């Protein structure tokens, strides 16, 4: 009597796809897509057209996932030596380097085609430039070359609102660049707070993060200064008439909270404060862009 087909291989297939999905850094991409969506919405005074909305979000997400996978590939050696990242798919051998490269290439290529065909070539090429900036210029070079790696490389990570804007308008606009400036200034205190918490691990793998090369106190001062600069930048949408009172109130509260956290980090000696600043920065960016979105539709 014939035996029924076995489905015992299904769990391994499921685990394999989970490994590939993990390489795309879905939580990071999700936050990035929020800023893309806000860029799209602020660019249009009316309801967004469906095709560039869907194609733009999908294509940008795929190319961002490709960049993240390349980051996993390039950093696989140091990831295996750090407590925060040792369990990633490549250090654990769940995905080979060859398959990771193929996955990143296919995902990025498909995302580029979607953007080029269904949105516009400008957005496709800008997203490709961001991919190169993050995966190759930052990850492969700047990260290992200078303690200003986050500052210089942060430009690539600040591009999503501009990508969203161009996806629906096919043109640059100064308002989109204001959103880029906000994320650009948000990036250093966000990552430096994490670097303070993980400074011993970065030193172990010879990554010249600012706390490793210039010390923790200097880094805390830089975090505080950047949060003040960020607070000023967050007011720019109001000053140019891009946003109204709702955003102004939300932005002011969020900036006050961020500066307070950075002040605590600088002047209070507590090991857990660095991670508090890191976590607060994530909520800060998410809520700030949600406030931009709500203000656009409720106050306009």
UniProtKB/Swiss-Prot annotation:
It is a multi-pass membrane protein. It comes from the Bacteria. GO terms for molecular function: protoheme IX farnesyltransferase activity. Pathway: Porphyrin-containing compound metabolism; heme O biosynthesis; heme O from protoheme: step 1/1. Keywords: Cell inner membrane, Cell membrane, Heme biosynthesis, Membrane, Transferase, Transmembrane, Transmembrane helix. It comes from Shewanella sp. (strain MR-4). Gene3D superfamilies: UbiA prenyltransferase. GO terms for biological process: heme O biosynthetic process. Disulfide bonds: none annotated. Converts heme B (protoheme IX) to heme O by substitution of the vinyl group on carbon 2 of heme B porphyrin ring with a hydroxyethyl farnesyl side group. Carbon 2 of the heme B porphyrin ring is defined according to the Fischer nomenclature. The lineage of its organism: Bacteria, Pseudomonadati, Pseudomonadota, Gammaproteobacteria, Alteromonadales. Its main location: membrane. Coiled coil: none annotated. InterPro entries: Protohaem_IX_farnesylTrfase, UbiA_prenyltransferase, UbiA_prenylTrfase_CS, UbiA_sf. It catalyses: heme b + (2E,6E)-farnesyl diphosphate + H2O = Fe(II)-heme o + diphosphate. This is Protoheme IX farnesyltransferase 1. Its EC number is 2.5.1.141.
């Amino acid at each position: 009597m014939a035996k029924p087909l076995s489905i015992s291989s299904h769990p391994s297939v499921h685990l394999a796809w989970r490994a590939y999905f993990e390489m795309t850094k879905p939580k990071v991409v999700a936050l990035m897509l929020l800023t893309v969506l806000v860029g799209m919405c602020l660019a249009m005074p009316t309801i967004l057209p469906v095709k560039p909305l869907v194609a733009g979000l999908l294509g940008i997400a795929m190319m961002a996932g490709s960049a993240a996978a390349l980051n996993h590939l390039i950093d696989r050696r140091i990831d295996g030596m750090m407590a925060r990242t040792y369990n990633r798919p490549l250090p654990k051998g769940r995905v080979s380097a060859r398959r990771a490269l193929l996955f990143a290439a296919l995902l990025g290529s498909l995302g580029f085609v979607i953007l080029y065909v269904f949105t516009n070539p400008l957005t496709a090429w800008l997203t490709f430039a961001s991919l190169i900036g993050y995966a190759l210029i930052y990850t492969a070079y700047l990260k290992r070359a200078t303690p200003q790696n986050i500052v210089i490389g942060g430009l690539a990570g600040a591009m999503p609102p501009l990508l969203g804007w161009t996806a629906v308008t096919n043109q640059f606009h100064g308002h989109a660049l204001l959103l880029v400036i906000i994320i650009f200034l948000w990036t250093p205190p966000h990552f430096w707070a994490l670097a303070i918490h993980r400074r011993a691990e970065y030193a172990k793998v010879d990554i010249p993060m600012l706390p490793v090369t210039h010390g923790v106190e200097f880094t805390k001062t830089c975090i505080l200064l950047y949060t003040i600069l960020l607070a000023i930048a967050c007011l720019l949408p109001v000053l140019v008439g891009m946003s109204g009172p709702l955003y102004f109130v939300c932005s002011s509260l969020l900036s006050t909270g961020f500066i307070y956290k950075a002040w605590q980090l600088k002047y209070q000696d507590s090991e857990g404060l660095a991670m508090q600043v890191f976590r607060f920065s994530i909520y800060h960016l998410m809520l700030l862009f949600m406030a931009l979105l709500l203000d656009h539709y409720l106050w306009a």
